[in-house]
Amino acid sequence: MQNIELRTGVWYNDRSIQLSFPDAWDVVTYWPDTPLPLTDEQIAERINRPVGQPPLRELAKGKKRPVVVVDDLARPTPVSRIMPFILKEFEAAGLRAEDIRILVATGTHGHQDSTALAGKIGQPAYQRCRVIVHSDLRGTKYVGTTSFGTPVYANAELPKADLIIGIGGVYPQHTTGFGGGGKLMLGVLGRKSIRTLHFRHKGVGGTYNIDNDFRKDVTEIARMVGMNTIYTLHINDRSEVVSLFGGDHYSYYPQAAAFSKQRYTAPLPDDADVVIVNSYPSDVSYTFVRKAMKPIRCASRDAMKIVIGSMHEGLGHHGLFQQGLSDRIREYTELYNRISVMKPRVILQKIIKNLFSRKQPPVKPNTVNAVSPPAHPMWLYRPEGATEPIQELEGVKVVKSWEAVVKGIQERFPAKSSVKIRIYPCGSLQCLDIPAGQDQGSGD
């Protein structure tokens, strides 16, 4: 048998799992080309030598109310790996851990499990600092409007802070090319601001272009609020830190995004019989497992599609892009969100356009090019250990046994002695180049 070791269970029961395949099968795993994990000495050096700014210990001198913005459980950033070094910098500036507020950037993601959050931030910081979990529905303050017309409602802690720094990561995003940088600000905004950003700007689809209006808008918000210092991490398929940028994110962000594109590039699964995507390290819930599904969306219609994810939070939650809804409800919800951010004249133009278009004779559907539903369900392998149940999902077959998956492959390809298997070990980190607009992933 051929054995492949992967990780699963981010934040809750992070562990190794083993996938076994018959020796005759053609199994290829597309591992990312990441460097070795950083040592303590390397992390300390990069924090002490930030890009375009003095060290944090100098920025923090004389400050009384610093805020550290960190991404939430929906992101795999191992904040605990660098938080001890950050606290040392504050201590060198004369600040105690008790003086520091850690603001968790949840966006519209809702509740955060306290035990998992303590593990992400690190127990010492979680116990000593004041940890505040952001709510997009309350506790925000209007701080202005961007040049794009986005009203900015930020967490009320930010206008009161005399120093704001961020800790986040750079992960592929269909909205801004990559996350991280100024996009970390989105997680500490009010619902109106977040809705406007998502539904006023077009995403970049299957490309990784960071030169887009969505990113320009969130970067402008970061400047407006004063989050000018961010520590940006890259991780490998085991959630170990392999790269760290710190300091002026406006300067270094293009380089950080280029690192992601270069190191995590993987080929398309063009000729695969079976495409297997491990959603770790974003397998916290089905909502965010979907961030890993680009190889699934790029696979041929006849390929067997398998996603791996523990999903300890079950279906999960997203205030704008909730999973598990019927197609009609999802369609109406998106329509409401889009209309809610339009200017009155734009709404009027669309109404007039619709009225005129209805007078045209109906166009017969092109049966040749019509998109038909998949012939087979996507398999979702949920390794044992997760306790939160998940509802039945249309077009998805959930299994908890790897043996059942292998049996399913054998039944699907009974005449093939050498089944062509292609594995993406950390799908939410990996980059696949496809034509713009072909891939429309789920929300943040």
Task: Describe the residue ranges of each PLM region.
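C-terminal non-catalytic interaction/assembly regions of soluble proteins
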Residues: E91, A292-D444
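N-terminal amphipathic/basic leader segments beginning at the initiator methionine
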Residues: M1-I47
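Membrane-embedded hairpin module used as a gating/binding unit in multi-pass transport
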Residues: Y208-V284
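An acidic, phosphate/nucleotide-engaging active-site surface
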Residues: Q112-F178
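Short glycine-rich or small-residue beta-strand-to-loop segments that form or flank ligand, phosphate
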Residues: R65-P76, R101-G107, V275-N278
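Glycine-rich phosphate/diphosphate-binding loops that line cofactor/substrate pockets in enzymes
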Residues: V51-V67, A92-E98, A266-D273, A299-S300, ...
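Active-site segments that bind and position negatively charged phosphate/pyrophosphate groups
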Residues: Y250-L315, G319, Y336-I339
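Divalent-metal (Mg2+/Mn2+/Ca2+)-assisted nucleotide/phosphate chemistry catalytic cores
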Residues: T150, A154-D213, V218
